[in-house]
Amino acid sequence: MYSFQSIVRRNINNITQQFERLAYVGNNLTNYNTKGYKTVNFEQMLNEDGYLTGAIRSDYAQGSIMVTSNPYDVAINGTGFIPVVSEDGEVAYTRDGAFKQGKDGYLMTDDGWLVGDGIKIPANCFKFEIKPNGEVFAYDNNESVSGKKIGTVPLVRFASQENLKFIGMNKFQATEESGEAQLVKNHDCIAQHNLESSNTNMYTGVNDMLRMNASLIAGMRIIKVVDDMYNKSINIREG
């Protein structure tokens, strides 16, 4: 038999879990138009004591591929990530290929992380080409037949990508559970002039948000009912 206090505690816990899940759903919807974004799911389970517990999981399903006019844009066909490095030497992995020519001519993410080991684009580059295997070539004029190789956009995979740690800004880091990044060779997965769209499903997200709002309202009503019953029982005893 549950006491008033245990019912209130359980409902407060469950409401807190629902608010946390609602925050993730809201973040997914906010990133609906973010290139390469992977939906973050807050999976809930009801334990034997009636308390909700949750686990955070990223959905790595590939989003749709869209063609762009930017030669620095790349999409990954299939599984894998592109390593990027911050100014402080921090290594992360992304599928957001909305790159640019940044400081000192290096190929960078939109927020200034170096792509791979550093790919410097020459100042006299007339044409910039990224081949399907990731090799990068620069042409100094429109009559060049064979450009100069200036680097490679690396592709890596993990033994258990589901256990990567999401650190924000479309970046992930390796964990002990995910295993170390393994360089993929002899592939044709890089598509220049393309970007991967977010894999967030707008319909599912809005539907989840509506259901959670209803659940939150119901949970708060239960607490109000229990509180009223508790106050009445106190008054009866005192009467």
Give the predicted meaning of each segment:
Residues M1-G239:
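Amphipathic alpha-helical polymerization modules
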